[in-house]
């Protein structure tokens, strides 16, 4: 007793002594183990070895006490084990003492039970129970060993279900070690083996410790059951949607069912679609009545809506997307509900035969425009005026006059835009049949088709059937295009048709006449030239013919030049060109048709080149004179063509009103022949510097006075119109022509001077060869050569500055730079 008390006193706490003086200290060491919970956790691992002898009994004793006191279950176990082990060791030393010691711990265990919470039990009743319990324990010791194993299993369960039994078992546990200590270890071995199996079950307990899995699984299962209960009703509604039965009320019901679900996923539309399905078979009949009533009231409205939409169908895209417009509006507008109800009526009609007929009659009206038969679709497209491009994306009201008005406005704008540049484009149109094809710059090729002729917008105007806007445009463009029409080769053939006036028609007939001798003019050009022949022949009969200056001697040529008031020219070709120009300016082009034919025969290279296409005569004259050095025919034809537009500019103001109106009226007929007639660049391969500059090309498409246009034609520079020549003193027309030709003559003189220069060597190429090789021309050196030697070869007394040469080079696309 004393030894046991000493052990208990060491581990006891003074606070709990008053409850039971001998027992409380035994309970306190358990609290000390409570202070170290990690020791309690490994203790069950150690249990197989420790329980092998006596610890199992102590466990049974402890388990029963903490079962009532859940707070101190684990801590009470190890201290009792220690006390039992000490008592067992002492019992082994002396067999008489263990009975007493067994009694004392039993009383202690009873006090522990009273401490753990059994306040109703008295300390006196406890010893009585212990006596009865001792006898029972002695009777069944082996059974108690098995029971201990059973209690261990119960310990693994530790649910606290049985609390009254453990106090009795504890008393028996204390008595059992006293009876048979040697036999208990054998039974303890068996119990340890069983304990090992029970440890596996403990691991299962630990798996069960995670409450979230059990709770989530249970809640999900319960929610799934609820959803399953809701699904049988909503499943039919899903099928109803496949039948295009859309009910706003059904949707709201389904949403409510989705809200009942525990998880948010029940609210997802996909889950809602499942919920829709079950309601159809169950409440399909009820829904049918509501649907039919709603559909009968709302069916006329969707009929009106497609009509509104059809009014907007003016484009291909609207036609194609017409069948999908209802679906798009259903989601956004309240009208969608009406359309859906009509569809639902059609679906419900399938279930009921009588309703099917009524709904089928109302529904086919929608698919008529939604889905058309191939024939009906083709007819609808044929009846519709289609606009392609960006306009097809626009929705406009269907009006038969709107498209016509649009076309009329476009035609007027095209006529208005084309009327001004038309003479330029006609003059710049090149015939693919010309003898000489020159390498053209990128900007000159840009505005031409595959055949080399200019792309013209007048053809687009011809396609329009409305002649009235053309008349309006011609009248408005008369004032603007007076000079343009005078300079354009398109106008001259038109004027001789309508008005056979003395000089202007003669001058304008010349380009067509020149176009005939061209080696291979187009068919339309031949027709125009034939018409011009009849008109020009009438005028040319009374007028003298141009003499063949090629047959004159140098002395005769110099006299003729002096007669026109020009200084003597050294170069024979230059004199012939000058005389031809002067004679044409004096007598008119109408007489030069035959003489030009003769001169072209005598000339080395006859060409229909830019003559017809040169409304800007001042520019083309110098260019053609430059070409005449290599080809006399070019220079001869060029002077003929150059003065007539100039004379037209002089003479047309007098008769411009009479001549221009008829010419404008005849424009739509003539432009195509002009395109074939005009050869934009009739220049040899060596004359690439005369290619049109980008500035000229811009001027081609912008109507300008003849002075600015002189830069536009392929052959001439911008600067040619600025310098007039006062050499022609015999007639005002000659003076005006020479004034306009003076600067072009200077540019042509520069061009001629380059060709007059003898061919250079590879080490020192001529200026013309440098230009052909795209070598940069140093302006100072070029000006020095022209002023000292080059212009002298041509008989030009004037001098040229570097700035002028820079403009001259830039106008022809020649690479130049300052030193």
Swiss-Prot record:
Residues 83-95, 212-237, 313-329, 337-351, 532-541, 592-620, 650-668, 729-741 have a biased composition (Polar residues). Regulatory subunit of the slx1-slx4 structure-specific endonuclease that resolves DNA secondary structures generated during DNA repair and recombination. Has endonuclease activity towards branched DNA substrates, introducing single-strand cuts in duplex DNA close to junctions with ss-DNA. GO terms for molecular function: 5'-flap endonuclease activity. This is Structure-specific endonuclease subunit slx4. It is found in: Nucleus. It comes from Aspergillus flavus (strain ATCC 200026 / FGSC A1120 / IAM 13836 / NRRL 3357 / JCM 12722 / SRRC 167). Transmembrane segments: none annotated. The lineage of its organism: Eukaryota, Fungi, Dikarya, Ascomycota, Pezizomycotina. Residues 681-690 have a biased composition (Acidic residues).
